[in-house]
Amino acid sequence: MPSPQLLVLFGSQTGTAQDVSERLGREARRRRLGCRVQALDSYPVVNLINEPLVIFVCATTGQGDPPDNMKNFWRFIFRKNLPSTALCQMDFAVLGLGDSSYAKFNFVAKKLHRRLLQLGGSALLPVCLGDDQHELGPDAAVDPWLRDLWDRVLGLYPPPPGLTEIPPGVPLPSKFTLLFLQEAPSTGSEGQRVAHPGSQEPPSESKPFLAPMISNQRVTGPSHFQDVRLIEFDILGSGISFAAGDVVLIQPSNSAAHVQRFCQVLGLDPDQLFMLQPREPDVSSPTRLPQPCSMRHLVSHYLDIASVPRRSFFELLACLSLHELEREKLLEFSSAQGQEELFEYCNRPRRTILEVLCDFPHTAAAIPPDYLLDLIPVIRPRAFSIASSLLTHPSRLQILVAVVQFQTRLKEPRRGLCSSWLASLDPGQGPVRVPLWVRPGSLAFPETPDTPVIMVGPGTGVAPFRAAIQERVAQGQTGNFLFFGCRWRDQDFYWEAEWQELEKRDCLTLIPAFSREQEQKVYVQHRLRELGSLVWELLDRQGAYFYLAGNAKSMPADVSEALMSIFQEEGGLCSPDAAAYLARLQQTRRFQTETWA
């Protein structure tokens, strides 16, 4: 039986599912299997009935929602009129990527797996549940699952006689060729594709809006341990509109110092211009890269040299290495037996791609430029809750950004790429423009004017609730109850004066929790319990909606536990009934969360 074309379809929000899908494509080609890799919504879903072998790679977002680039597919595949034999010719497998700190961990992958079985598909394997919370990340589940997958696939569809697997030490052809230009082209100028003011289409990832930064203000006290910024952008003429709960995506860049260091280590001329040419006819050039492009632009705006490399990075780097000792170490890091050592070298200290290349200088200096886009992942956009309403701040968009910085055993502090880049931008020193676009968030607020809302937002989790409060107050909705948690009243009490003014106007009831101002720490869940009778009255008798945003570590579980206690003490419910009551709130979208790790 001839080997079929393997189809890998992905639904990806942050890029991880796409990375895993491309890894699947590489491993398939190494095993002499033809392979196509596509986003689910770019694939004509009606053709699925003709596909013999499909791997689905799906992330789960928000409250168990599918990623944006598989929502059309999701609606189609769950149509009730699809026959139960629609996919009876298909062998399939589903690989899920999620975060076990969320209640609906890998919900999309689990639900899709069940649906494909209902439609007659044959599962090659149980669904894979990759977990961001694992110390090795999703690879802890993905690696053994992929080994089993290839055993099953090759057992069903062995390669033609005489065609052996391409050995791991031999690099596959690069996805692109870089055609270097001897001189600058006479027409056109380098720059990313952007949405221009007055454009018919709203800004998107392929065409972001270059928003002028109006202000970049630190809102934590000078002695506070964390630098938190309130940043405002001008979106006049962008075509951007948003509502409370929506998020803005920002495309960050690498620092000039890191770009210079990268070019030095790899022996690249940052001003060298090139044209990017795909090797395969069905592969298109990245829309974010101009043609022609300079090496400086590629490294500054596209290659994520500040990310922690995955195992696949070491696999390809070992293939490209010409230095015996360095190659030996890279092969060890990329082997199954070397994963513990790789974790200690790379994952635990959060060592970056740039730092790894500096540790392997002979290998780095010999990397063919054609392989840069295969070796280094693309810089992914970062999502921030919008912290303002267009009804209060017309043509403006504000975000609250906690600058990520922490120490590991490495001498240099670890810094978040996007938050550090944003914090470094100073509109007072000259014009600053930031590529951004907006998408719907996971929080949806009630449209009925008399429905109260309870919002629990410790730290920067308060950002979407500021947008909601501004929007609701502008619409005359006064039933706003905000539980805000921070450490110190005089250090990180964001928008204190604004909240107090709204309280004076009877537009807001503010319940703060200052965790460090007394010997016994007080958190938002403690204030909820203190005001349990009010919370029960609002939820049970007034039909209030309850919202929670912030760090996913333990706060969501603590708040849920506080609610369960309130339901039992104030509502007289037994424990199972309290759990059922909470579940009903979640099912009817009267209890919504937006948390992050």
From Swiss-Prot:
Xref: Pfam families: FAD_binding_1, Flavodoxin_1, NAD_binding_1
Keyword NADP: yes
Every Flavodoxin-like domain range: 6-150
Cofactor(s) it depends on: FAD; FMN
Residue numbers spanned by region Disordered: 188-207
GO MF assignments: electron transfer activity; FAD binding; flavin adenine dinucleotide binding; FMN binding; NADP binding; NADPH binding; NADPH-hemoprotein reductase activity; NADPH-iron-sulfur [2Fe-2S] protein oxidoreductase activity
InterPro entries listed in its UniProt record: CysJ-like_FAD-binding, FAD-bd_FR_type, Flavdoxin-like, Flavodoxin/NO_synth, Flavoprot_Pyr_Nucl_cyt_Rdtase, Flavoprotein-like_sf, FNR_nucleotide-bd, NADPH_Cyt_P450_Rdtase_alpha
Subcellular compartments: Cytoplasm, Perinuclear region
Residues annotated for FAD binding in this entry: R350, R382, A383, F384, S385, G416, L417, C418, S419, W596
Highest taxon in the source lineage: Eukaryota
GO cellular component terms, semicolon-separated: cytoplasm; cytosol; intermediate filament cytoskeleton; nucleoplasm; perinuclear region of cytoplasm
GO term, biological process aspect, one: iron-sulfur cluster assembly
Binding locations of FMN: 12-17, 59-62, 97-106, 132
EC class (word): oxidoreductase
Ranges for domain FAD-binding FR-type: 206-447
Tissue expression remark: Low expression in brain, heart, kidney, pancreas, prostate and skeletal muscle. Highest levels in the placenta.
Binding site for NADP(+): T460, S515, R516, K521, V522, Y523, V524, Q525, D558
Keywords, comma-separated and alphabetical: Cytoplasm, FAD, Flavoprotein, FMN, NADP, Oxidoreductase
Enzyme Commission numbers on file: 1.18.1.-
Family: Belongs to the NADPH-dependent diflavin oxidoreductase NDOR1 family. In the N-terminal section; belongs to the flavodoxin family.
Functional description taken from the UniProt entry: NADPH-dependent reductase which is a central component of the cytosolic iron-sulfur (Fe-S) protein assembly (CIA) machinery. Transfers electrons from NADPH via its FAD and FMN prosthetic groups to the [2Fe-2S] cluster of CIAPIN1, another key component of the CIA machinery. In turn, this reduced cluster provides electrons for assembly of cytosolic iron-sulfur cluster proteins. It can also reduce the [2Fe-2S] cluster of CISD1 and activate this protein implicated in Fe/S cluster repair. In vitro can fully activate methionine synthase/MTR in the presence of soluble cytochrome b5/CYB5A.
HAMAP family in alphabetical order: NDOR1
Subunit comment: Interacts with CIAPIN1; as part of the cytosolic iron-sulfur (Fe-S) protein assembly (CIA) machinery. Interacts with DCPS.
PANTHER family, per the entry: NADPH-DEPENDENT DIFLAVIN OXIDOREDUCTASE 1, NITRIC OXIDE SYNTHASE-RELATED
Name of this protein: NADPH-dependent diflavin oxidoreductase 1
Species name: Homo sapiens
